[in-house]
Amino acid sequence: MANNNLNRPLNTNVADSSNSSSTPGTAPPPSSSDPQVLGHQAPSSSASSLTEDCSSSFARDLNSYNNGQSGATGAVSWEAPHEPSEANAVSQIHPRNGEHSLQQKPKPQKVSGSSSLATSERYKTELCRPFEESGICKYGHKCQFAHGYRELRTLSRHPKYKTEPCRTFHSVGFCPYGTRCHFIHNQPEQQPVLSESTLEEPSSFNGSNVLHLGVNGEQQPGLQSDSPSGFLSVNSQALQAPLQLNQQALSSGGVMPSSHPAAANLRMMCCRTSSSTTAHDADKDPDKDADKDPSNNSANDALAFPQEPGDFSPVAFQNPNTATTTPTAFYNNQQQMGLAASAQFQMPLARPLPSATIFGQASVGPALTPGAAMAPGAALAPAAALTPAAALAPGAAMALGAAMATGAAMATGAALTPGAALALGAAMAAGAALAPGAAMAPGAAMATGAALAFGAAMATGTTLTPGAAMALGAAMATGAALAPGAAVAPRAALAPRAAFAPGAAALAPRAALPPGAALTPGAALAPGAALAPRAALPPGATLRPGAALIPRAALAPGAALAPGAALTPGAALAPGATLAPRAALAPGAALAPRITITSRAAITPGVAIAPGVATASTGILAPGAATATVGNTSSTTITAATAAEGAAPHFTFQLPDVESESESESLEFDVVTSTLDSLLVSDDEDEDDFLRRSSSSSSLNESEFDNTNSSRRLPIFSRFSDSEK
């Protein structure tokens, strides 16, 4: 018979199809006298009960399909391997589905320390590491580990094995159980779902000879399964995840593209089931007609699964849970060449691949350098770079082309726009942001420990030019901003604890804010003139809204410029001018070069002070008052408006070094003194009385008259005394 010819190379007895004791399409019970079967080791009763439902359902569907066929078909059977335990095997028939399976009866053994290990469920389920490394094991055949793949066996799996996703793996991307986990890590690990329309008649597998027989004809019983179903199942320690078959493609006869992850695996598991060619193919070399196999012809394009009998049918074959089948193909090639077990290819352990997760295909992200870290929720755009030890906090984002230097950090919610960069040790606090279009130019940096406080921002168009830096501890307060076009020029710096209040403007090249200095809201530093090179605001100094300082101007600690006060370009508070502590300039007031305002002095609006003039402490200049310098003579012109007079007369006080006076001046004073008819006092008394009367209509400083000589006479009083004499 064709079936006998088919199974002759495997030395397996096949019963006639007319035998009523065996169900068509299933393997008959093997003889107990067969030495090959006697060497087969039985699985535990608990493991058999776990897989009974799966095996019975599979055989039930298979029997229902075979009953509809007109002719008898061959059964799939394979030679049982030798095991060092020397156990006796008996045949049992499941009453529910008539399926034959092997139930093994262990032979009594001598009591020894290794007897418990030999009967363990995990006996020979893992490779012996010393044997794999050196080819020698001191335990010999008593070793509980497999010496090569020929002794390797697998445990029967639970019916729900690899049917649900692993929550730990898909939540954190790591599972401590690794490949031993009973849940799904990668998409190809899911169990195959086989329907009646996809179940073809089991037949010989052309690749089974390749997997079980070497070139020297030696059997490879290590690739076996303890499943009671009796069907071919190949496994090893790394081959633990069953293949997920495309049920729609199998049932509808569709074409599976070659890019599908299971396409390469399915190519290795397709077998010819035509009864007219099975005997002829079994006698030939498995690799002789490999080019004629239709599965090879469709490997590069697609795999077709027609529903007609006699073509291709899938076989329960376990594959590695990696996305590629290159390690499996390499392993098959070594089996064909008859390589030693110790030199065989070790299958890699399964790793979580972004493209093979069951929750969807993940996008390919940019690479991180060693030591770089990204917290959950952080985002790194394509072409962005994280150098070693740099870190992105949750919610932080780096746009295209942005870079972070070694040790730089971004807090939660911080963001860097394209081209922006953070230097070593620099940090952006929570909520800090560089607005769209803001940039840190090439070479610009935030020094170690510098920070942008919460809510601080750089507006559109702002730039930090090359060489600009924010010193250690410098900060921009909440809401502070650099307006469009504002810049911190090269070598400009903010000292520790310096701050820009909301609405404060920029610093010119080489300008500096010393520790504790502040720019209050609304203060303006004019472009090109405000806080120019070497200009400084000492600790505690304040610029009010609208106030300005020209180059080399200075404000002493505690000094203030009132709102609206102006320092005129080139003259107001020029180089060398100083405003003492608690001194103030009212709106509209101005200071000329080399003017010094002492403590507690106040200048009212409209008052101007000429160069070289100094005001005393607590001195007051009324609105409209002005000082000027004429040659070497220092004079004071005061214009005062009172409620009693619409206009005040002009008084001129001249020092005694004047040699003569004009006649017109004498006439003027005669008219003024004609009303003083009761003035008949002495010269000293006349002079004192004049000072008392003139002080009520003038705002001259009394200190200017303290040094007057008592013997000094005014011309008008000299004239009166001469006429009386």
From Swiss-Prot:
SMART domains: ZnF_C3H1. The keyword Lipoprotein does not apply. The chain crosses the membrane at residues 380-400, 420-440, 441-461, 468-488. Changing R157A: Reduces ARE-containing RNA-binding. Loss of ARE-containing RNA-binding. Disruption phenotype: Mice are viable and fertile, without apparent morphological or histological abnormalities in the placenta, but display a decrease in the numbers of surviving offspring. Display an abnormal accumulation of placental 3'UTR ARE-containing mRNAs. Exhibit also a decrease in ARE-containing mRNA decay in differentiated trophoblast stem cells. GO terms for molecular function: DNA binding; mRNA 3'-UTR AU-rich region binding; RNA binding; zinc ion binding. GO terms for biological process: nuclear-transcribed mRNA catabolic process, deadenylation-dependent decay; nuclear-transcribed mRNA poly(A) tail shortening. Residues 193-711 are annotated as: Necessary for cytoplasmic localization. A zinc finger (C3H1-type) spans 122-150, 160-188. Residues 1-25, 693-702 have a biased composition (Low complexity). Residues 280-294 have a biased composition (Basic and acidic residues). Rodent-specific retrogene derived apparently from its related family member ZFP36L2 mRNA. Placenta-specific zinc-finger RNA-binding protein that destabilizes cytoplasmic AU-rich element (ARE)-containing mRNA transcripts by promoting their poly(A) tail removal or deadenylation, and hence provide a mechanism for attenuating protein synthesis. Binds to the 3'-UTR ARE of placental target mRNAs, such as TNF, HBEGF and LIPG. Involved in placental expression of many genes important for normal placental physiology. This is mRNA decay activator protein ZFP36L3. The gene is Zfp36l3.
